[in-house]
């Protein structure tokens, strides 16, 4: 059965199941720490049959671990499918391949790493008109990251500000005339991993090497204490390989449309 990780004991079990798993330990662990005792935050955390856990926020779900095999696994997949339908989740990331009725596989995400203690050659600094900011205002940053969705920008702003206020991670931006035009940040961390995310350049300023400079610079800073990891869709794999990051795995990605499923 699906159990809400709403007690200290169940939250401890949730953390045990994601321990030492790249991407999942830092992201799900940070979210549980920050939001696990605040149901009104919009985040929800569950223990599933087998070794699996589930995180939900809005229409997005993340599943780490494995459901049981055999008949118990069939029952677990049926229960999970109904649960996701009930909560209107339409995107799902998983540690392992998973077959659920009505869900279609999308291109998996590639997981990248820069090991602790390693650094990459820093790309050339941008022209002087671009001013580095190591503690930018998160409101304009959120509007840059999600320029086409105020709702997603608001969600990102809330989560990022909560993380930074609790000493988790950091944000970097390049400002042009006082406005962020390129950013990357780290808003989830475990004891051994800093997860980088939200690397975005304003389309008007793309192709100038701004993202290369910010991403490598932040990764080099963070590897002093932890390994750096992040995930990307296939279109960006060549970019990160060229910078020198190492591929270490895949994160499965699934979508559904409950109107047609």
For each predicted feature, which ranges?
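Short amphipathic alpha-helix that is part of the acyltransferase structural core
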Residues: 1-29, 108-112, 116-156
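N-terminal charged segments
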Residues: 1-100, 147-151
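A conserved beta-strand-loop-helix scaffold within acyl/acetyltransferase catalytic domains
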Residues: 56-57, 152-200
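Conserved acetyl-CoA-binding loop-helix of GNAT-fold acetyltransferases
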Residues: 72-83, 197, 201-203, 207-221, ...
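Conserved hydrophobic beta-strand within the GNAT/NAT acetyltransferase core sheet
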Residues: 227-233
